[in-house]
A protein has these predicted regions:
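Extreme N-terminal starter segment of soluble prokaryotic enzymes
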Residues: 1-4
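Short Gly/aromatic-enriched secondary-structure transition segments
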Residues: 44-52
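Basic/polar, acidic-poor N-terminal "presequence/leader" segments
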Residues: 41-44, 72
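Extracellular beta-rich ligand/substrate-recognition surface
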Residues: 7-14
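NAD(P)H dinucleotide-binding glycine-rich loop of Rossmann-like/cofactor-binding domains
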Residues: 97-161
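Well-ordered beta-strand positions in beta-sheet-rich domains
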Residues: 16-18, 119
Length: 161
């Protein structure tokens, strides 16, 4: 399926492109992005390119979709996740995975998973870690602001007051 998105190829090298998404695997989920917040972390990744700790070293060959604060609709569910997720449901994502000790994260590290695309593929590890969240609210932007709000709350609790 065709999608349009903002992909990073390196330092200060962002491109709006139309490209083909592969068919999802049994352990993946296809989603339609509706809202993606803009974050200074994304700006930092765009400036640093592969020097950013979450951006793959081969980003010039295998570009990633940027945007990690996103929400939208589930379009297609791989067989592994059909009991937990349904087509048409709304979702929000928690991008801080720390999967098996890696720094990989949606919006920084994956060729087919990021918020700045019309459609993307959520990889298995996101669901394995419970980071694809069902969203019951009305406004998609509220769901895409969940991650930055959690940063604010975490910073508040980390401060002496």
């Amino acid at each position: 399926m065709k999608t349009k998105g903002v992909r990073m190829y390196g330092k200060n090298d962002l491109r709006v492109e139309e490209f083909e998404l592969p068919e999802i695997k049994d352990d993946e989920i296809l989603v339609e992005n509706i809202s993606d917040s803009v974050c200074m972390s994304t700006y930092k990744a765009a400036i640093l390119g592969k020097e950013h700790k979450r951006v793959p070293k081969d980003v010039d060959i295998n570009p990633i979709i940027i945007g990690h604060e996103f929400s939208g609709n589930i379009v297609k569910v791989g067989s592994k996740w059909k009991e937990q997720f349904k087509e048409g449901e709304k979702f929000a994502i928690q991008p801080a995975l720390n999967y098996k000790g890696t720094m990989w994260s949606p919006g920084y590290s994956y060729m087919y998973c990021g918020g700045d695309a019309t459609y993307n593929i959520i990889p298995n590890e996101v669901m394995e870690l419970g980071c694809l969240l069902n969203y019951k609210g009305e406004a998609y932007y509220e769901a895409s602001l969940a991650e930055p709000m959690s940063c604010i709350i975490g910073a508040f609790h980390a401060c002496y007051h």
